[in-house]
Amino acid sequence: MKITTWNVNGLRAALRKGFSEHLQQIAPDVILLQEVRARPDQLPDGWAAPKDWHVTWHPAVKPGYAGTAVWSRRPHKVLARGLEDGIDDDEGRVLRVQTDDPQGKPVRVASVYLPSGSSSDARQQSKEAWMKRFAPFAEGLRRARTPTLIGGDLNIAHTERDLYYAKSNQKQSGFLPHEREWFGTLLDTGWHDLVREHASDVDGPYSWWSNRGQARAKDRGWRIDYLLGNAAAGKRFKSATTHRDAGLACSDHAPVSIDLY
């Protein structure tokens, strides 16, 4: 079973840049989208309910901003929107569903778009408040006996292997010491960073690149798009792939996939 996460940086723009063709090449059973930036009724004809997919959208209230979605080849059931703590998810940042693998066994996935704090101190404060709320949410998912995955743009590079220019970004949002510590705590509780487990101790594979300079062409990026698995998912983990070419073509993020036995 292949599960893919992709921050598309605006689905309408990605569709014009070859999203459909790259999706066919990747051929996931489930795709988790972030930064959709559109309501279904704003998409080109046929894309609100694309053929051969079961689709749930979770757009932001603010037009053209954030938003998540889950597409699956087999029917899925929506389990929740948001962090399930009584606070409205007006920015459409979390969508959680349950679907089945090809053998008919249940698998749970959450498409997550953690806020960025890079634009201002206020946005960083908002990000950190969101992180505090996310930790207990993630712990609840981790305990499930059903294979469960959190996939998405988490806007944090965990270690120096996850960021090309690590030394010069020590004080930048996304690589702050307390953000990295927070991420490490998630892993310490029992979440598996499946891409890192597959890549071992190599640098990257990066999943986001700045548009400045030659960062994209020279693969000088950040690894901030993750697929985290609980213990049940970790036992079934087979392999991981970062689709750099698709990222360069359609978005500033690469799609990232994992395969489960």
Feature-to-residue mapping (PLM):
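N-terminal, active-site-proximal structural segment of metallo-dependent hydrolase catalytic domains
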Residues: 1-49, 54, 60-66, 158
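Active-site-proximal beta-strand elements of phosphoester/diester hydrolases
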Residues: 1-9, 106-121, 151
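Active-site beta-strand/loop signature of hydrolases that rely on acidic residues for catalysis
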Residues: 6-7, 23-43, 109, 138-160, ...
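Structured beta-strand-rich core segments of catalytic domains in phosphoester-bond hydrolases
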Residues: 37-117
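Metal-dependent phosphoesterases centered on the DNase I-like endonuclease/exonuclease/phosphatase
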Residues: 51-54, 130-224
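Conserved beta strand-loop-helix elements of the APE1-like EEP
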Residues: 63-79, 202-203, 212-236
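Active-site beta-strand termini and strand-to-loop segments that position acidic
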Residues: 73, 97-104, 219, 230-231, ...
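Surface-exposed cleft-lining segments at the edges of enzyme active sites
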Residues: 84-85, 114-131, 167-171
